[in-house]
Design a protein with these regions (language model features):
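Gram-negative bacterial Sec-dependent N-terminal signal peptides
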Residues: 1-2
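Substrate-binding clefts and substrate-entry loops adjacent to catalytic sites
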Residues: 514-516, 520-524
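His/Asp/Glu-rich metal/cofactor-coordinating catalytic motifs and the adjacent surface-exposed loops
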Residues: 22, 136, 148-159, 168-181, ...
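Aromatic- and Gly/Pro-enriched helix-to-coil junctions and flexible linker segments
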Residues: 5-232, 241, 319, 464-515, ...
């Protein structure tokens, strides 16, 4: 049986997606034929995606402002059932039931949506808006199906596109391996790794990644990347301010009194004390990220990012906590500021005995990142903010929810304030956010000290806020002493936690955040953008399922994305020829500029030494870096200053390394192992072939490209080299030696009678300014 679409397009029942139909099967068994399938498909792809998820769910859900109404939906992102089928089936039934209700022979659903009947959300849809038309079409279709008239008035057809990755080339396995080893371990692939991948393809990648993820460089990158997300290094007043004066006043400044009498010279002693303090502060800043590294390194469930009942301490930070004497025997080297071990803090003791921390266990109630002092200092509170910043960041970091996107901004704040005594608890446009945000803010109520971290509000918690809890569950009074642990336990059971951690891994690998569902239905590219979002979302959820099955081992998520076509997509030129696919594929493929840290590591991996200038924090900010405080977003698109830095880097690195490489024995060279400086283009056919082979090697080492010796790219580089040498030979008075500034350190200026060293230096400069080097 065939249905006619809106424009006469035939749609067979077999073409209607089986997984979606299963997920939204009607509870009403009277309508299970093809007509009902059309209603299902239209509901999922149109009504739910465009209306329900965007306009209804924020209030009509457990814990939402309309949770006591008869129209209560379930959030699919919190549904752990296969394909989120349980929630989608529930929502379809709820919509269908509401669509059949009438008031004065008009649809109750449409009247409420436009604010013509009593509706707490007022007019969420404007009459004749795109979303209203979708909902009206659905109501008409449901009533027609109920009356057996659907075939006379068919629902619009939902267009099918080509397979999402049709026309997309995947990255060569060698290039994929190079990308992964540079990204995760700051090195080029080893010969045995390349051989394994060449032999077994993607099957070998898991084993290779197992080795990569045991390297120290991987954990350095992991900490750096998660700081981009948590920004935990960016709090004010010095690192030691995380240890509150009220609880650690006698120990947090231990470096000022540390015995350095063995250093006789006063200036040297003062310098040593400065270094001691700097190392101590750096050790404190690293603590939250060392927790993350410890979890991953030891294959612990990544749920410990919020449930760990310990923090990480080094010999230096242990002194700050006043715990060094009891821990010193557990350290391998008590003078190493960056050796960390897991430690449980005793409950906090205040200078005022009445304000000691209450703890039934006798320990500080650790809850992973949620309770570490540095995280709490990074996201402080005020008398007016009332921990709402902390609640907002909790949702963003651990559940992937941007609370500010739950509802539109209040249109007339003065009018709302005048109308309601407590707008955040009474005004619908305020409640939609605050009923989610404020209960979590209340969870943090005992962490209210502005200058420190722990300390309940002296006047008790606010009465004009929704009570402490999480998503409709109230915090039991007996759990208040461990409220953050209670929150953590609820967090890791929420399917959004696993999905969010997988999204973080995507950001770490690609430098981009996952796609959000498009909102503007009148955007001509809406369908293409939605298809791109759905494809990426499906992949994210599939990797999240593997992540959960692997007991939340973060390495599983990394491997999942590494093998994903979203990470491996390479040449999209063919697909981009279709304008409709241009919007669909706009975010596909890796094309983000390397961060300052990544660029320095890439230079070091290829040339054996870093450039060095981007290690300066202020200079790095000019190249898109962050300080985790004022500058918190990395600039991914190069501007004028960044372009100038790229040119300077290319010139400096080539100058420092080309003559140096030629000065080494051929077997030890990175750049020019099979060519000497006495060989110039145009001298012989054999010589030109050797030069082209040297260029192929350079392209592989510097750019990660495996170009054929006869390729256009190799010809372009060859012509550049030949042109420079030809131009030099046509000039008079040029020196026959390399520049003084580019000579190897401690050596004489190397002879360069044919200008080949300088020409090769120009070639390397050219390659270092290529997109393949500067971008990932």
């Amino acid at each position: 049986m065939l249905l006619a679409g809106q424009h006469g397009t035939a749609i067979s029942a077999a073409e209607l997606a089986p997984d979606k139909l299963a997920a939204s099967a009607s509870t009403d068994t009277r309508h299970q034929g093809t007509s009902c399938l059309a209603v299902d498909r239209y509901f999922l792809d149109e009504v739910w995606a465009k209306v329900g998820a965007q306009s209804c769910l924020k209030c009509h859900k457990p814990g939402g402002d309309a949770e006591d109404s008869k129209f209560v939906l379930q959030d699919p992102s919190r549904d752990a059932s296969p394909g989120q089928g349980a929630s989608l089936q529930h929502n379809r039934a709820a919509f269908r039931q509401m669509a059949l209700q009438r008031k004065n022979n008009e649809s109750t659903m449409l009247l409420k949506a436009t604010g013509e009947l009593d509706h707490g959300g007022e007019d969420v849809l404007k009459p004749d808006s795109p979303r209203y038309r979708v909902l009206a079409e659905y109501v008409r279709g449901v009533r027609a199906a109920q009356e057996g008239k659907l075939e006379a008035q068919p629902l619009p057809a939902v267009a099918e596109g080509p397979p999402f990755f049709e026309g997309i080339e995947m990255l060569d396995n060698r290039r994929l391996l190079r990308r992964l080893t540079l990204t995760l371990a700051a090195r080029l692939p080893k010969a045995e790794e390349l051989a394994a991948v060449q032999k077994d393809g993607l099957k070998a990648m898991d084993t290779v990644l197992d080795g990569v993820m045991r390297e120290d460089a991987f954990y350095q990158r992991l900490a750096e990347a998660f700081n981009d997300i948590f920004l935990v290094r960016g709090y004010d007043d010095g690192a030691e301010s995380a240890l509150s004066y009220d609880h650690f006043s006698g120990t947090r400044h231990w470096t000022q009194k540390h015995n350095l009498d063995d250093i006789v010279d006063e200036k040297a002693r003062q310098k040593a004390r400065y270094k001691l303090a700097d190392d101590y502060r750096e050790a404190l800043l690293r603590e939250p990220l060392e927790l993350l590294k410890h979890i991953v390194r030891n294959d612990h469930p990544f749920t410990e990012i919020v449930t760990a009942d310990y923090i990480m301490m080094s010999p230096y930070t242990a002194r700050g906590y006043g715990m060094f004497e009891q821990l010193k025997d557990k350290f391998t080297d008590t003078e190493d500021p960056y050796e960390y071990i897991p430690v449980r803090l005793p409950s906090l003791k205040s200078r005022n005995v009445k304000e000691h921390q209450v703890s039934e266990s006798g320990f500080y109630p650790h809850a992973g990142m949620l309770s570490v002092f540095q995280y709490l200092r990074r996201y402080p509170t005020t008398e007016t903010n009332r921990n709402r910043l902390r609640a907002r960041m909790y949702y963003q970091h651990f559940l992937g929810v941007d609370v500010l996107e739950l509802a539109a901004r209040v249109s007339d704040a003065a009018a709302v304030t005048a109308k309601y005594e407590i707008p955040t608890m009474q005004a619908g446009e305020c409640v939609v956010c605050h009923k989610t945000l404020d209960p979590v803010a209340g969870i943090f109520q005992d962490y209210y000290s502005f200058t420190g971290v722990f300390g309940p509000r002296k006047d008790g918690w606010f009465k004009d806020m929704f009570g402490a809890g999480f998503e409709g569950d109230d915090l039991p009074p007996e759990q208040r002493w461990r409220s953050l642990q209670w929150l953590a336990e609820h967090t890791v059971k929420d399917p959004r936690f696993a999905t969010t951690m997988v999204e973080h891994v995507y950001y770490i690998l690609t430098g981009r955040k996952v796609l959000l569902p498009p909102k503007a239905l009148d955007d001509p590219d809406y369908e293409a953008k939605r298809r791109a979002y759905q494809a990426q979302r499906k992949e994210t959820e599939a990797i999240a399922a593997k992540f959960v099955k692997a007991n939340f081992n973060l390495k599983t998520a990394i491997k999942g994305w590494a093998a994903s076509p979203f990470y491996r997509a390479d040449d999209i030129a063919t697909a981009m020829k279709n304008p409709k696919r241009h919007a669909e594929l706009a975010d596909l493929g890796l094309a983000h500029m390397l961060t300052p840290e990544q660029l320095e590591r890439k230079v070091a991996a290829i040339f054996g030494q870093p450039w060095g200038r981007l290690m300066d924090k202020q200079f790095a900010i000019l190249y898109g870096g962050i300080d985790s405080k004022e500058v918190t977003e990395r600039a991914m698109d190069p501007g004028g200053a960044m372009g100038a830095i790229q040119r300077s880097m290319a010139n400096d690195v080539a100058c420092k390394n080309v003559a140096l490489d030629f000065s080494r024995p051929a077997a030890e060279r990175r750049l020019f192992p099979k060519i000497e400086t006495d060989l110039a283009p145009g001298e012989s056919v054999e010589g030109d072939q050797r030069i082209r082979e040297a260029i192929v090697h350079l392209h592989e080492v510097v750019l990660g490209r495996y170009d054929d010796v006869s390729s256009a790219e190799v010809k372009r580089t060859f012509d550049l080299l030949a042109g420079i040498i030809s131009d030099a030979q046509s000039r008079k008075g040029l020196e026959k030696v390399e520049s003084y500034y580019c000579k190897p350190s401690g050596q004489e200026r190397p002879a360069d009678p044919k200008y080949t060293i300088r020409a090769w230096r120009a070639v390397v400069t050219y390659l270092l300014r290529q997109r393949d080097f500067l971008f990932e």
